[in-house]
Design a protein with these regions (language model features):
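Short, charged, surface-exposed secondary-structure boundary motifs
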Residues: 76-78, 141-146, 216
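Active-site-proximal specificity loops/subdomain of glycosyltransferases
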Residues: 48-98
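A structural signal for isolated positions on well-ordered beta-strands in alpha/beta enzyme cores
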Residues: 7-9, 37-39, 65-67
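GT-A fold catalytic core of metal-dependent nucleotide-sugar glycosyltransferases
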Residues: 68-74, 88-140, 153-155, 162-163
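N-proximal low-complexity "stem/linker" segments adjacent to membrane-targeting elements
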Residues: 1-29
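Short internal beta-strands
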Residues: 36-44, 134-135
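Short, surface-exposed amphipathic charged segments that create phosphate/polyanion-binding patches used
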Residues: 77-87, 147-151, 221-226
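Catalytic core and acceptor-binding pocket of nucleotide-sugar-dependent glycosyltransferases
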Residues: 133-139, 153-244
Length: 244
């Protein structure tokens, strides 16, 4: 019997190579019965480093693919002043346009994530008819009236996204998000996450909060046993430490 295959996506530049290794190590350690195909868009990383990444991934019965992004694809996309973002944050918009047609579903993960459980449940979530599944932010950016997102709990965090490739492409999510970024740079705070929330308003599957736990979701001043109990059953811990 062949192990289950899950398609993952991660994008980063040379500054996040070490966090990428932390991410995939946590995935392999907690999903030993699963094989992965990791689709990556990486810049600033040399061929030697890519070969080392490939060797590491193959040791865990998995594969990795590298995709190239053209500078013109992200030219003119805004990075807010005094922001810690780089243009690499925009790379994730391009995965559905780049992966082979055999990939029907793709789980995108930011590189500031540690996986502490089985990814099968999130990967097999039913998102038929929707371009994406994501976790709504209820303790950070609850809504964004300036973007036309008034409902509390409607704004989602794009650090974990389960992409339905055919629906995403059919609805031209990437193209519409990029167009928004070009048309309304003055509205952009959380870069492509803002754009995706605009074009996917009322059009995504809300995933369980256990699949994207940020520091803002964790209660403060609990005893150690309280934190242990809170984290029980959680799957993805996302170290998004900038307050929204």
């Amino acid at each position: 019997m062949y192990p289950e295959l899950i398609h993952l996506a991660a994008s980063f530049d040379q500054n996040y190579l070490t966090p990428f290794y932390v991410l995939i190590t946590s995935i392999f350690d907690n999903n030993k019965e699963t094989s992965f195909h990791i689709h990556t868009i990486v810049t600033g990383v040399g061929n030697q480093e890519k070969e080392e990444m490939q060797q590491f991934v193959r040791q865990h019965n998995s594969n990795i693919s590298f995709y190239e992004i053209a500078p013109k694809d992200i030219e003119g996309l805004v990075i807010p002043e005094q922001s810690y973002f780089t243009r690499a944050t925009y790379y994730r918009l391009f995965f559905p346009l780049m992966v082979p047609e055999t990939v029907k579903k793709l789980l995108y993960l930011d590189t500031d994530i540690v996986v502490v459980g089985d990814l099968s449940e999130i990967y097999h979530t039913n998102i038929i008819g929707f371009p994406v599944g994501a976790v709504a932010e209820v303790n950070a950016t609850k809504n964004r009236p300036d973007l036309g997102i008034d409902e509390i709990g409607a704004y989602f965090n794009a650090g974990v996204m389960l992409m339905n490739i055919s629906e995403w492409k059919k609805q031209e999510i990437s193209e519409r998000a990029i167009q928004f970024l070009h048309d309304f740079p003055e509205k952009v705070v959380w870069v492509d996450q803002d754009a995706l929330n605009v074009v996917l308003k009322d059009n995504y599957v809300k995933l369980s909060a256990k699949f994207n736990v940020t520091p803002f979701d964790i209660p403060r001043y609990l005893p150690k046993s309280g934190y242990h109990n809170f984290l029980k059953g959680k799957i993805i811990i996302h170290y998004a430490l900038r307050e929204h």
